């Protein structure tokens, strides 16, 4: 933020994602997202994040799923697969890590 000190670009919100995300979106109409990093591990918070935040991702924006495809955190994958259904985007894996996860670019 030192490049543009008078504008706050980061806001940490403490609380239950299932409550704070809907409230945050309601309080910030017109918000757009260029990078959505989902690192929630389990189903319900991931579903909430997708329901409320994915529609705000700009075309060309990046969506990163930290635990997609991990056996220990199947909820994140399930929420993603259910959200997109037949229109599921192809997850691009990072070549520099042995763990699953990855990203896609919103059309």
Predicted regions mapped to residue ranges:
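S-adenosylmethionine/decaboxylated-SAM
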Residues: 1-107
């Amino acid at each position: 933020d030192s490049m543009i000190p008078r504008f706050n670009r980061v806001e940490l919100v403490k609380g239950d994602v299932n409550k704070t995300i809907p409230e945050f979106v309601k309080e910030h109409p017109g918000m757009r997202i260029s990078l959505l990093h989902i690192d929630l591990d389990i189903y319900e918070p991931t579903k909430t994040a997708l329901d409320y935040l994915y529609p705000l991702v700009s075309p060309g924006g990046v969506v990163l799923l930290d635990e997609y495809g991990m056996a220990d955190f199947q909820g994140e994958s399930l929420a993603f697969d259910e959200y997109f259904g037949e229109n599921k985007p192809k997850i691009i894996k990072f070549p520099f890590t042995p763990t699953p996860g990855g990203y896609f670019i919103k059309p």
